[in-house]
Amino acid sequence: MNGTEGKNFYVPMSNRTGLVRSPFEYPQYYLAEPWQFKILALYLFFLMSMGLPINGLTLVVTAQHKKLRQPLNFILVNLAVAGTIMVCFGFTVTFYTAINGYFVLGPTGCAVEGFMATLGGEVALWSLVVLAIERYIVVCKPMGSFKFSSSHAFAGIAFTWVMALACAAPPLFGWSRYIPEGMQCSCGPDYYTLNPDYNNESYVIYMFVCHFILPVAVIFFTYGRLVCTVKAAAAQQQDSASTQKAEREVTKMVILMVFGFLIAWTPYATVAAWIFFNKGADFSAKFMAIPAFFSKSSALYNPVIYVLLNKQFRNCMLTTIFCGKNPLGDDESSTVSTSKTEVSSVSPA
């Protein structure tokens, strides 16, 4: 084995070097230079300083503006809640540990950080699935006329949390475990070891199939059908400027949704899968650290894609920020009316 396994950790360096120490007790500067840990801390500070205001502002604006309390917007707010969880319980901890060069909070802190980060990421992922299914049902009409109501929205939100807990909770109860990963400053599920006491292999397979491959397949299918439906509608109404505009907006939103998710999470999932299927292979700490920390950026641009590109949310945000005045000069009332019409037709909401 080209790594060192200890109690509640796996360091991707052989102990034959004589350098390996517990990531809960000693700085891991033999894995990366101290300045690289400081760069990591700076990156996380950037995500915190941007992600918390954007996600927090989404929640504040929704609370202030009754017109935003539409069923579909509840799912968008759920995304902001997920992002806030990742920032408050994941990024802050990792920022602190990166400054120190090791996971100073111990195994219990590692389990809590890994759980909260996984929970936030999974809530966001399954929120996207609910959005995809809602758009598919409303636009493609496989069930005929369908109105997305508040009860549907709350059921969808409950579904996202149930699925997220089904993924994040098992390592807390003995099915796999959370251990430091990459540069040993953040924690995630144990892809690395074959410890029979934790049944890591069955958990990782379950997680990949049920909490990555399945939701990605649903997103691709539903948005693929959505684009085809919008294109067909545009072809039948070529003189309709509103339909053509709707096609462009939906296509742009679909591209941003799909690529935003894939860009954030596919590198991490790919590297984790490679490590899982090549246990004992030689790899550096940065090989896992880079995609792991890059995936955290989703907490920043998720609200940009799913909220700031929504005219209704954007105008209300600007009104809140500028104390009741919208510097863009958009008519908020007409925007709300347009937004409501688009939600029930072919817009990306």
UniProtKB/Swiss-Prot annotation:
Principal localisation: membrane
InterPro entries listed in its UniProt record: GPCR_opsins, GPCR_Rhodpsn, GPCR_Rhodpsn_7TM, Opsin, Retinal_BS, Rhodopsin, Rhodopsin_N
Record-given protein name: Green-sensitive opsin-1
Region named Disordered: 329-349
Family assignment from sequence similarity: Belongs to the G-protein coupled receptor 1 family. Opsin subfamily.
Molecular function terms, GO-annotated: G protein-coupled receptor activity; photoreceptor activity
GO cellular component, one term: membrane
Segments crossing the lipid bilayer: 37-61, 74-99, 114-133, 153-176, 203-230, 253-276, 285-309
Keyword terms: Chromophore, Disulfide bond, G-protein coupled receptor, Glycoprotein, Membrane, Phosphoprotein, Photoreceptor protein, Receptor, Retinal protein, Sensory transduction, Transducer, Transmembrane, Transmembrane helix, Vision
Organism: Carassius auratus
Intrachain disulfide bonds: 110-187
Protein's job: Visual pigments are the light-absorbing molecules that mediate vision. They consist of an apoprotein, opsin, covalently linked to cis-retinal.
Composition bias, Low complexity: 334-349
UniProt membrane topology term: Multi-pass membrane protein
Record's keyword annotation contains Protein transport: no
GO biological process: one example: visual perception
Glycosylation sites: 2, 15
Tissue expression from the record: The color pigments are found in the cone photoreceptor cells.
Subcellular location: Membrane
PROSITE patterns per the UniProt record, alphabetical: G_PROTEIN_RECEP_F1_1 (PS00237), G_PROTEIN_RECEP_F1_2 (PS50262), OPSIN (PS00238)
